[in-house]
Curated annotation (Swiss-Prot):
One GO term describing the cellular component: mitochondrial inner membrane
Membrane topology label: Multi-pass membrane protein
Protein name as annotated: Cytochrome c oxidase subunit 2
Location in or out of the cell: Mitochondrion inner membrane
Transmembrane residue ranges: 15-45, 60-87
Amino acid sequence: MAHPTQLGFKDAAMPVMEELLHFHDHALMIVLLISTLVLYIITAMVSTKLTNKYILDSQEIEIVWTILPAVILVLIALPSLRILYLMDEINDPHLTIKAMGHQWYWSYEYTDYENLGFDSYMVPTQDLAPGQFRLLETDHRMVVPMESPVRVLVSAEDVLHSWAVPSLGVKMDAVPGRLNQAAFIASRPGVFYGQCSEICGANHSFMPIVVEAVPLEHFENWSSLMLEDA
């Protein structure tokens, strides 16, 4: 969970998100080294009184500054492509949930069950219980079993939305008339918060997403209770 004055990302709750965090550190290290080198060269050029009469025509320098950036780009691109393919892989999901964006709430339908679905609205500030988070709590959470592949089918009823949960490394656009899909595996139990990440109107800021990952037996008990109340 994020906390005040935090500078880094949220703790990863999915293997692919852990890969994304490692890639972020990898890319940031390369950017830092390049920035340091450029700053040093600029400082040296401004402060030195020496000149090089061959500075306008140096084949060796041109070869270096052509090949070296290409190598650096490859070092960034290869791990990025690997993670991109991992994010698109959806192999034999144990549970499929349809998330539909509306102005301004989410509705969820568990397609593996005959009659399990609900709308999820933000809890108003005056109704929050002690310890709950303002603008992030919902009246109904999307409950999923932990350590199980979950597929989320994302679409929208009216305008563009985006279903995003940072801790799970998921962000998928909800486009009216189109069905997009994303997948995740919650590696630990917990409550993971997200929000609509596409500006969708006046109350865009009030479309929170709450995913609760629980052990399988707890999920079965929850689904049984929901089906009884339906």
